[in-house]
Amino acid sequence: MTAICAPPRGCEPDDVIELRSGGARCSLWWGATPSHAGRRTGFIGAIEAEDDDALPAVLSRATDRLRAQGCALAVGPVDGDTWHRYRLVTSSDGTPPFALEPYTDAVASAPWLRAGFAPLETYASYRDDALAARDPRVPALEARLRGAGVTLRVLDLERFDAELEQIHALALRGFRDAPLYAPIGFEAFAALYRPLAPLLDPRLCPVAERDGRIAGVLFALRDPHAPETVVLKTVVRDTDRRLAGLGFVLTDRARAAAHALGATRAISALQHDGSVARSLAADAVVFRRYAVLAKELQ
């Protein structure tokens, strides 16, 4: 269960705060964290507590430490960077956790709110139970992209590391404008995705190429605990404006493949509210919301 539902922890922290009372501890990062709206951030993550009542106290200690380091904004939970585990669930309709979801109880945000934190960035996961439907706009989009030199294929698991090298470079370009983004080295990136290889079905992972390199990719997998569900985990495309609509096409390909394989539900996971992809199916509905929280320090 852990291997498919718990994303790995992040990089080594700059400090660790620990309270003996309540068994609470957290890790802090500030040395290489990205700014947010021009303000220097410090991250709080890897939080553990035997008693939830101890969390406000350890968060208070953490914010004092980040303030002393010159941070203007304490942000959490973030385990080092947004390539690793981050976010809290803030609301849910009761749908069970899905594969690779950073799931928490919806009440987990309460200690943060009591400590003076508020939502900084918000996200949602969407449920799509109409996989048989194909958007009529897709053929025209595919034709335009073919005219721009784009070809489509499936992920090559026989050359997975070679695929990951190109996907890493693509992700650095495609995600660079995402909130709280910081670049990550190839080995750290590959360490996140290599363990997924046994779970991936290439038919669910469309890849777009142009000029001999990967220009877009979608990672999706069958949920081992709900085989009728396919989780659309990550979609990224090159930022070239001529590739507008490619994310939509990749998502449509994955949905069609899921339907052909007998799946009845697709989950578009952890979409940022400020940039929800237009590739979301028209019938998709929100079933879970998440947030990264922050507290002003200066």
Residue ranges and their predicted role:
Residues 9-21, 36, 194-206, 285-291:
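A short helix-loop-beta-strand connector motif used in the catalytic cores of GNAT acetyltransferases and
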Residues 102-180:
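Acyltransferase donor/substrate-recognition loop-hinge adjacent to the catalytic core
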Residues 8-101, 209-235, 239, 297-298:
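Conserved donor-binding loop and adjoining core beta-sheet/short helix segment
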Residues 66, 172, 197-198:
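Short regulatory alpha-helical segment in sensory/regulatory domains of signaling proteins that mediates
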Residues 83-133, 196, 203-206, 210, ...:
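Active-site/acyl-donor-binding loops of N-acyltransferases
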Residues 1-7, 176-192:
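Conserved GNAT-fold acetyl-CoA-binding loop/helix
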Residues 54-61, 163, 246-250:
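Short amphipathic alpha-helical coupling segments at ligand-binding clamshell hinges
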